[in-house]
Structures are given as structure tokens and as C-alpha cells.
Amino acid sequence: VYKRQELDFLFLCSPSNPAGQAVEKEFLIKIAEKCEKERVRLVLDECFVQFLTSGEEASMQLETGRFRYLFVLQAFTKIYAVPGIRLGYGISSDKALLERMETVRQPWSVSTPAQAAGLSALKEDHREEQTRQLVKSERERMEKELENLRIEYIPSEANFLLFNSEINWFEELKKRGILIRDCANYRGLGNGWYRMAVRLPEENDRLLECMKQVLNERS
């Protein structure tokens, strides 16, 4: 951000994936101010922002009006649990940029089922808060269970947890019918890092029970 000639775009993800940690809004505003000054396009991925305790208040989408170089990405698929429809959107106040994007947009970029699902989701205001509270409660419970199992993890604010272990959890859980994300191919992580989703209580119970079984077999 400090040397304009070396940077055209800055991509940030908040909350991040796969760690699930968010950048404080005050700091994001400072970054946006610096990018505006240096004429660097700031692309902010907020696909998991609805899972934060503060919800939409943590979002930078309303700041796009004051920062022309800010482009915010959001999605319906995470908080509303409809990944199959692949529905998301971008927000920017840069009309020239939006016009250029329109010239290369695919003719059928959003399917009819995705449009219908998105419109239906917008009517479910109460469900977003219910989901946020459920995920928060289950995530905190799972973090405590990982501590009890002496498994290192990264505190998260999203609907998943990143943890580290010498055990090949991807293969061990796959044998038991559970799939988690092997994060070995993430830059900066490597072997031994895994991401597991925070799901419904009964599903989380099954995952944790399987992890206990694996550890007991190895003790």
C-alpha cells in the first residue's frame, strides 16, 4: 500500500479463510484511506462477515460511498447455507469501474433458481440472527472440546475452525464418514493444518466423538 508503483490491487478477506479471524473495522478504514490516497484498488472479501457478533455493523459496504477505490464482496451462500446456488455480489461507488465490468459480464451470470433463492433469503431477517447465535454457541463449545483434547486451534469468528495436529485427521475422519478440509495446500500453513465446519449440534457431537475415538485408539 505504501508504494503505488508496485501495487495496483490489495485483496483482503475479513473474516479470513481458513482462520476465521476478522480485521477490526477501524483498521480497515485506515487501510481504505491509505488505498484511496495511493489510488490502490482495495478488494475486501466479506463473505463470512454476517457470522461476526456485530453482524452487518462490521461490514465496510456502507463505506463504499466515501471510498471510490473500495470494492466489497459479499455472498448469500454462507450465512443462509445455500452453497449450491453460488450467489454473491459486489459493491462499489466507482461508476467507471462498474461500467467496464458490465462490458465483460457473462450474459447469464446469475441463474433463475439463484435469483429466487436470494430474494427468498432477504425475507428471512430473523434467520440470520438465529444462525449467527447458533454458530457462535457451537463454535465456542467446539473450541473448549479441542482444548480438552489438547488440540491446537486458531480462535475463530466464523463458521469454521482451523486446527493443527500431527494426526492425519482428514484420513481418520474420512474413514468414519466425515469430511474436513485438509489445508496443507494453503500458503503459509502446510501439513498438519485442517479446517472443520461448525454445523448443527448433533453433527458437531458426532465429529467430536469420532475425534475422541481416534485419540483413544492411539493412546
Functional labels for PLM-detected ranges:
Residues S92, F163-S165, V198-L200:
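Short beta-strand-to-loop capping motifs
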Residues K3-E6, P18-L42, E46-I79:
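Active-site pre-lysine segment of PLP-dependent enzymes
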Residues E26, K175-R176, N185-S219:
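PLP-dependent enzyme catalytic core of the Aspartate aminotransferase-like
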Residues E140, E145-G177:
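Conserved PLP-binding catalytic core of the aspartate aminotransferase-like
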Residues F9-C13, V43, Y89-I91:
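Structural motif
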